[in-house]
Amino acid sequence: SPXIIIDYLCVTETX
């Protein structure tokens, strides 16, 4: 995920 706030996977990447 690019890290979009809408994308929950962004939380794990930016985390």
Swiss-Prot record:
One of its GO terms (biological process) is proteolysis. Its main location: secreted. Binds 1 zinc ion per subunit. Ca(2+) binds at D7. Its cofactor is Zn(2+). One of its GO terms (cellular component) is extracellular region. The keyword Chaperone does not apply. Belongs to the venom metalloproteinase (M12B) family. This is Venom metalloproteinase. It comes from Tityus stigmurus. The lineage of its organism: Eukaryota, Metazoa, Ecdysozoa, Arthropoda, Chelicerata.
